[in-house]
Amino acid sequence: MPKNVTRRQFLRSGLMSTAGFGVVLTGLPRLPRRLASPSVLLQDTNMTALELTGSLKQVHDPVIIKAEDAYYLFSTGNGIAVRRSTDLLEWKTTFPPNVFTRVPAWALEMVPGAASMWAPDISYFNDKYHLYYSVSTFGSNRSVIGLVTNVTLDRESDDFEWVDHGLVVESHLDGDYNAIDPNLIIDTDGAPWLSFGSYWSGIKMLRLDYATGMPSDEDTTLYPLARRFVESGSVEAPFIIQRGDFYYLFVSFDFCCRGTDSTYRVMVGRSENVTGPYVDRQGIAMLEGGGTQVTFPTDRWRGPGHNSILHEDGIDYIVHHAYDAQSQGVPTLRIQPLEWDDEGWPSVAP
């Protein structure tokens, strides 16, 4: 995999073809090419979502990267849960099933009572996979974001080993932001940036050092990206991609983790600069509560949110979790194609 490439850019560049990896994934099913017009109707009549099988339940905050031999999915869980697929459709739990066997000791010292690790994000640059993760407790902004790296995701390789580099950024009880839900993007000039945030004063961004993956000493500004003033200030889970002349900031509004009562939904804004300002389709700044809705609930799939984006075979897919009303509200993996209109705005059918 080439240097200086994040998951989004690597997939978008077309380097994720089988030739780019020196492997051939045979027998791949034909993936859907077009979307019907998006609808707000709470009916499950569309055929756009990928028909997934395997280990799909108990998935929160999913993110996918295509590596040397397969697709890998990372999600919230005890030690960061890992799943693997060779075709993007059938998912199997890896063995061992987690990145960590326990919450790192350094994180427990800083966040007493933390029981699990949340909202991972993975990218490849500087010859390593960089997985950012968060540790916190519900309802608190005493939180930390850490970094663990690996030179390969192939567990059969002799080089496979996760190396934890510890603290990247933290937030405190007397602060106005929350250091969880990290997402990395490398801008068009080759500089890495980490966005993060949940509730409080919203989504923030800081510049990273390319060599270390840690905060930059050259630019220490904490840039504000998005904020809400209603629904308890519920905006979180940033994910940024670059497309055409714009950077697109996806976030989740409202409430997760309530089963079929969850009201999570993905919103988006865009900017010509990675640090903003981001505005929605109506021109409302995301720092003023703006956002154009992307995902909608259906009779079956409630609270579709906390997304990542995967570009594969010429299609952008939104990867997220939703709560399955036909399975007692269990959080479940969903992958759906995005369609971009003539004005450069994304949408997805329910």
List PLM regions with ranges:
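Carbohydrate-active catalytic/glycan-binding domains of CAZyme proteins
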Residues: 2-29, 35-350
